[in-house]
């Protein structure tokens, strides 16, 4: 077999008949599968052992040769080679067809490649292939021209002959009529009888005339058709064709079916055709030019590759190996078989019947029908259902053809190549393990024993607890006591991977050190739940075991939970104390007025703890405490006058706060404040930035332990009586009810419109709700458990408390519009029937939304991953001098400079493109990382915008460079070469997708257009779709004139430079953003609404469209409170703008209208210019992520994404080769991915031994030393035991 590591690219092309025969190990001649009695394969059938290899290892069909010692012998009785049975997975066969057939992909795909090549409409092509019309394949024009006069003479002679025959027949009839009439006259018949005879004669004469005329017309028709006959003419009239062939058969040839197509292809002159098409493109216009371009693409594909167009017509069909289309016996003695076997059987049956008919010399019409059926059978085998009705199996189920095997989620690509089942894995329900350290997980004993079985068995043998592997296995299966001790030993320091589906981002798989636990549930650390999005209501998780030392090292260094504290999407910590822990720490750090022991002073912490233990001091009482000098004072602490650092000092604090500070690192300043969720978040962020991973993990564990400990002791409970309703609710509502009635009266009098009434009512009731909520908050005691939860941030928010305690407020209906009457009851009071009904309405919609959203969001992630999967950091610096301007601050009206609100997602973690110089002094040097500190320093120096590097300006040929990408947000350090930043970007954008809304909001009632928000808006942007209700932007600089008629409204821009004015038709109701007479810039938006990104690209260029897309996507995520760094969106946008569309081809081989990647285009141009030619011109195009994924250089990646058959057809014709640069391609063929430790520069490292090592290696071993070769000769490859040959040992 081919070793996957020894090739760098993979080419796809068209197989010729010779290729197919070369792959084949024999011809399949019979449709039989296996013998019903012996259950052995039939000879020459679809499972034949002679062709495909033996069904059992080292055993021929007849049983003459058994055992491995006969390896390679071909049995003379049955012709089967003695070898391994697994060759039945790789040996192919073939079927020699009695008549050629066309390949359905190339004839039926859109566009039809065969049709483009031969310049035939697919309808006509179908007529020829399926024997409904004849096609002329060759005309001897010279001979025809030469013999035309003599042929014409022959025809005219024949015509005269026909005319003479007609005239004599008519004359004959006339004579007979005369005789008949004379006879009747003699007999004295009546006039009536005479009239009848005369009429009959006239009728016959008319018939003679008509018949003759028809013959003459037919002759004329045949002659005219022949005179103008040219290659590729179709003739559907069989009679006419036959007559033409009988008369002028030596001047032309024609045929039906694939044979005719094959002849046509054999004589097809590609070069001449290409020249002709280029001429049309140079001179032609419109439709004609467009068609010529499309045809030239196909023609030049065959010209420039090794493919022959003959490959589109097959003389033989390959038969895939039998183990890939197996036949298995079910319990009931019946057989289950792959659909392919049925499809192959139909092909073989029809092929054999056709052979027999040809041998018998059957009439042409019968043979043609059989040929058509053979063509249809092969079509069904390749792609069932592509043409006509699909072939169905039992129960009217369409059979799965070869194409279906590749397509879709269940196809070969997505089911078996990109995702595989993993050995050494298990899954179980998860429960919380509060006693675990951050890097640990609890693994059930039974599960651990099964996972680590081989390790335990080996260790048992090493420790002499078992004699051999077999007895060790028995010991493990019987779970002897010694086994558990060995398991403990084996398991220590051996990390396992835990994964929770759906794995939306890379934190969905993390490594932990297993701890053995009783029971059957996996225990996980409470702090990693956020990353996994896990809860303990029945979630399950999977465990995987890294086997090799390298895998264990990578799991420990890169994937251990303690190394994954920051979120890759925005660099914020993801392991945060939540819920119980927050409430415990909040309780611990609260300072309570008038608590027991308030105002006392303690000389050291021991005294305070003793007082607490004796019940003399409350945990939350305000005390004075003498603190040792090695404790860093609080940040804003003002020291006494003669204070020296290192001296003890006195702090006003509580015992609880001191205990809280025991959890933080030694040198962290004393925290003397109440710690809620926000404060804890800030604390963890600071720790992650300034301290080592070990210290952060220790602190987090200490915080977790303290949180649970004090949450337990806080005695926090909740009951309905803790929900305190606001005392003045009724008075407030009455006051606003009067205002509402006033508005209603104004409306009834017609003073305001319905729209205004709605707006006013909504405004009034919003104010009322807010006032009731305020009243509620003012009347809630600080130690109220419900409010403690809300204020600490551990659970719930004021809105929810408001709905339970005070007032439900305004709700929306199913359309998403707000209903202008509020729900005045709270949940505590209970809702009336009407209130209940209108509130369930909106909530039900919300639930339905969530279900749809999950699917949509998953598909978006899949497309994003696909478009960005080959963006890997490939080099340290691409050396570009391009940059982006990034705002980091804004000037207030009073002159002070403040930070821009979202700097942490725009300017933070970037690389400076230039030195920042203020007043001749360099504040920040080029290529430095913009940290929080540096941004503050720049703002202090009065700098509000900086030049940064970004993925959008990176000039790396493949992937991006580390400098342009900047800091890796997951580690807080500069990104490493080999980081798969494209995948991280896709995950960061896709993971919060489920949190986005689905709705289209309505702007105030009926008027105004709908604005797309949430997930649909993100999809619209990434797919580069033209939005609904698109707003025009000005193409020129100038003044605006607005013209309105009754029906329409126009905005006209009069350019300053006096060129033609540009007019834009806008909807009557659309709100304008410009006034009459206003000056507008190029690219300024004229109407409210969404802008078409393609227009921005056309008018303002790539940079503007990049910034538009990034900011618009950010808008959606920001509105939902999701924080994502710009660099992730920039990577996706970079992929969307990677290609250019060729306008003029110059002297290059490119075709106008062709899409090509920019670096490749520039390189082609450079080459042509160097040779003194004319370069090509192109314009940038914006592709949606689906289109961009399908347009990738890698055909493997595109085929495994969507439209598999189309991608493979297209790329096979162009003979594309896949450079294997992305991740997917390498996963598919089973190579190491070129990212992370799989990068070549990390793989190609050799460790040189030291001099001593070399010396000891080359020294001669003395006889006491064991010999080096204790094992037999052979490779160091592991041999599976069941395959190992133990000589004559009879298994």
Swiss-Prot record:
Q: Which UniProt keywords apply?
A: DNA-directed RNA polymerase, Magnesium, Metal-binding, Nucleotidyltransferase, Transcription, Transferase, Zinc
Q: Does Magnesium appear among the keywords?
A: yes
Q: Which cofactor does it need?
A: Mg(2+); Zn(2+)
Q: What is its EC number?
A: 2.7.7.6
Q: Where does Zn(2+) 2 bind?
A: 878, 954, 961, 964
Cofactor note text: Binds 1 Mg(2+) ion per subunit.
* Keyword match Magnesium: yes
Binding positions for Zn(2+) 1 per the UniProt entry: 60, 62, 75, 78
Q: Which reaction does it catalyse?
A: RNA(n) + a ribonucleoside 5'-triphosphate = RNA(n+1) + diphosphate
Q: What does this protein do?
A: DNA-dependent RNA polymerase catalyzes the transcription of DNA into RNA using the four ribonucleoside triphosphates as substrates.
The protein's matches in HAMAP family, at most eight in alphabetical order, are given as: RNApol_bact_RpoC
Q: What is annotated about its quaternary structure and interactions? A: The RNAP catalytic core consists of 2 alpha, 1 beta, 1 beta' and 1 omega subunit. When a sigma factor is associated with the core the holoenzyme is formed, which can initiate transcription.
Q: Tell me the protein family, please.
A: Belongs to the RNA polymerase beta' chain family.
| Protein name stated in the entry | DNA-directed RNA polymerase subunit beta'
Organism, scientific name? Thermobifida fusca (strain YX)
């Amino acid at each position: 077999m081919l070793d996957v590591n020894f090739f760098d690219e993979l080419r796809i092309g068209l197989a010729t008949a010779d290729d197919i025969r070369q792959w084949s190990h024999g011809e399949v001649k019979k449709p039989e599968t296996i013998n019903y009695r012996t259950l052995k394969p039939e000879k020459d059938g679809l499972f034949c052992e002679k062709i495909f290899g033996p069904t059992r290892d080292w055993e021929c069909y007849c049983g003459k040769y058994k055992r491995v010692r006969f390896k390679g012998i071909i049995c003379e009785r049955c012709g089967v080679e003695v070898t391994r049975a697994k060759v039945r997975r790789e040996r192919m066969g073939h079927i020699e067809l009695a008549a050629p057939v066309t390949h359905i992909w190339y004839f039926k795909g859109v566009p039809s490649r065969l049709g483009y090549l031969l310049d035939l409409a697919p309808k006509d092509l179908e007529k020829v292939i399926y024997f409904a019309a004849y096609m002329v394949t060759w005309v001897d024009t010279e001979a025809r021209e030469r013999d035309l006069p003599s042929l014409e003479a022959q025809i005219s002679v024949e015509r005269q002959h026909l005319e003479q025959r007609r005239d004599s027949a008519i004359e004959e009839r006339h004579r007979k009529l005369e005789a008949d009439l004379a006879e009747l006259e003699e007999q004295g018949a009546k006039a009536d009888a005479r009239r009848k005879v005369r009429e009959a004669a006239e009728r016959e004469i008319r018939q003679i005339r008509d018949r003759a005329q028809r013959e003459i017309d037919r002759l004329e028709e045949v002659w005219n058709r022949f005179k103008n006959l040219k290659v590729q003419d179709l003739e559907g009239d069989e009679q006419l064709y036959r007559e033409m062939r009988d008369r002028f058969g030596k001047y032309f040839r024609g045929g039906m079916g694939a044979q005719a197509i094959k002849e046509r292809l054999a004589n097809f002159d590609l070069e001449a055709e290409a020249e002709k098409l280029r001429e049309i493109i140079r001179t032609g216009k419109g439709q004609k030019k467009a068609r010529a371009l499309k045809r030239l693409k196909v023609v030049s594909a065959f010209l420039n590759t090794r493919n022959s167009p003959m490959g589109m017509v097959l003389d033989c069909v390959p038969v895939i190996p039998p183990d890939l289309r197996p036949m298995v016996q079910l319990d009931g003695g019946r057989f289950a078989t792959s659909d392919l076997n049925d499809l192959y059987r139909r092909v073989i049956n029809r092929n054999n019947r056709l052979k027999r008919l040809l041998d018998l010399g059957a009439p042409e019409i019968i043979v043609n029908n059989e040929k058509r059926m053979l063509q249809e059978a092969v079509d069904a085998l390749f792609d069932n259902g592509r043409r006509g009705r699909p072939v169905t199996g039992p129960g009217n189920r369409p059979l799965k053809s070869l194409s279906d095997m590749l397509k879709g989620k269940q196809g070969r690509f997505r089911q078996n190549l990109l995702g595989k089942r993993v050995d050494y894995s298990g899954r179980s329900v998860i429960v919380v393990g509060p006693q675990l350290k951050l890097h640990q997980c609890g693994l059930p004993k039974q599960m651990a024993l099964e996972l680590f079985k081989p390790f335990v068995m080996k260790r048992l043998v090493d420790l002499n607890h078992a004699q051999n592997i077999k007895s060790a296995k028995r010991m493990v299966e019987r779970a002897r006591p010694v086994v558990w001790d060995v398991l403990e030993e084996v398991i220590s320091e051996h990390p396992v991977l835990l994964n929770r589906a759906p794995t939306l981002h890379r934190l969905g798989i993390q490594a932990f050190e297993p701890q053995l636990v009783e029971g059957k549930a996996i225990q996980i650390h409470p702090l990693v739940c956020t990353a996994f999005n896990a809860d303990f209501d029945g979630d399950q998780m999977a465990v995987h075991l890294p086997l090799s030392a390298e895998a264990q090292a990578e799991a420990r260094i890169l994937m251990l939970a303690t190394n994954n504290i920051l979120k890759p999407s925005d660099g914020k910590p993801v392991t945060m104390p939540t819920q119980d822990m927050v409430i415990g720490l909040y309780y611990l750090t609260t300072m309570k007025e008038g608590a027991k022991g308030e105002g006392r002073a303690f000389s050291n912490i021991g005294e305070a703890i003793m007082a607490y233990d004796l019940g003399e001091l409350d945990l939350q009482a305000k005390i004075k405490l003498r603190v040792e000098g090695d404790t860093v004072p609080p940040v804003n602490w003002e020291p006494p006058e003669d204070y020296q650092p290192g001296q003890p000092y006195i702090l006003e604090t509580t015992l609880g706060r001191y205990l809280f500070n025991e959890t933080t690192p030694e040198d962290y300043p004393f925290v003397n404040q109440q710690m809620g969720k926000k404060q804890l978040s800030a604390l963890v962020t600071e720790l992650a930035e300034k301290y080592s991973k070990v210290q952060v993990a220790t602190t987090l564990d200490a915080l977790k332990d303290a949180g649970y400990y004090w949450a337990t002791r806080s005695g926090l409970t909740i009951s309905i009586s803790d929900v305190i309703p606001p005392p003045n609710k009724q008075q407030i509502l009455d006051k606003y009810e009067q205002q509402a009635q006033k508005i209603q009266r104004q409306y009834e009098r017609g003073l305001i419109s319905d729209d205004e009434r709605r707006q006013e009512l909504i405004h009034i009731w919003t104010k009322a709700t807010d006032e009731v909520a305020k009243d509620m908050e003012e009347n809630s005691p600080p130690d109220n458990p419900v409010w403690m939860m809300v204020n600490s941030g551990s659970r719930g928010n004021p809105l929810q408390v408001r709905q339970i305690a005070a007032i439900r407020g305004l709700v929306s209906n199913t359309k998403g519009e707000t209903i202008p009457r509020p729900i005045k009851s709270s949940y505590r009071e209970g809702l009336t029937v009407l209130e209940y009904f209108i509130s369930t309405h909106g909530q039900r919609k919300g639930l339905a939304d969530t279900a749809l959203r999950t699917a949509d969001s998953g598909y978006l992630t899949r497309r994003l991953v696909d478009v960005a999967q080959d963006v890997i950091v490939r080099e340290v610096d691409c050396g570009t001098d391009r940059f982006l301007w990034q705002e980091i601050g804004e000037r207030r009206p009073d002159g002070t400079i403040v930070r821009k609100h979202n700097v942490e997602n725009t300017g933070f973690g970037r690389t400076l493109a230039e030195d920042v110089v203020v007043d001749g002094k360099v504040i920040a040097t080029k290529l430095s990382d913009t940290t929080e500190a540096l941004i503050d320093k720049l703002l202090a120096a009065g700098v509000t915008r900086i030049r940064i590097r970004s993925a959008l300006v990176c000039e790396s040929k493949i992937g991006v460079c580390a400098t342009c990408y900047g800091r890796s947000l997951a580690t807080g350090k500069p990104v490493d070469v080999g980081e798969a930043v494209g995948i991280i970007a896709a995950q960061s954008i896709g993971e919060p997708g489920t949190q986005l809304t689905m709705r289209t909001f309505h702007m105030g009632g009926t008027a105004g257009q709908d604005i797309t928000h949430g997930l649909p808006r993100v999809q619209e942007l990434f797919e580069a779709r033209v939005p609904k209700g698109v707003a025009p932007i000005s193409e020129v600089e100038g003044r605006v004139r607005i013209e309105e008629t009754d029906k329409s409204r126009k905005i006209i821009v009069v350019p300053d430079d006096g060129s033609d004015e540009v007019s834009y038709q806008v909807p009557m109701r659309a709100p304008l953003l410009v006034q009459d007479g206003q000056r507008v810039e190029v690219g300024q938006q004229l109407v409210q609404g969404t802008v078409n990104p393609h227009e921005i690209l056309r008018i303002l260029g790539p940079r503007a469209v990049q910034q538009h897309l990034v900011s618009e996507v950010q808008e959606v995520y920001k509105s939902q409170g999701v924080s994502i760094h710009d660099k992730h969106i920039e990577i996706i946008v970079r992929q969307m703008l990677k290609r250019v569309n060729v306008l003029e081809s110059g002297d290059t081989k490119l075709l106008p209208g062709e899409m090509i990647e920019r670096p490749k285009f520039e390189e082609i141009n450079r080459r042509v210019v160097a040779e003194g030619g004319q370069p090509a011109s192109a314009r940038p195009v914006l592709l949606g992520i689906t289109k961009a994924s399908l347009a990738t250089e890698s055909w493997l990646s595109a085929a495994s994404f969507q439209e598999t058959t189309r991608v493979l057809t297209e790329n096979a014709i162009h003979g594309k080769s896949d450079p294997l640069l992305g991740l997917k391609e390498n996963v598919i063929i089973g190579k190491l991915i070129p990212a992370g430790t799989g990068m070549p520069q990390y793989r190609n490292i050799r460790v040189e031994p030291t001099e001593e090592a070399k010396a000891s290696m080359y020294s001669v071993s003395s006889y006491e030393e064991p010999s080096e070769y204790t094992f037999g000769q052979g490779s160091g490859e592991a041999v599976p035991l069941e395959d190992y040959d133990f000589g004559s040992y009879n298994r």
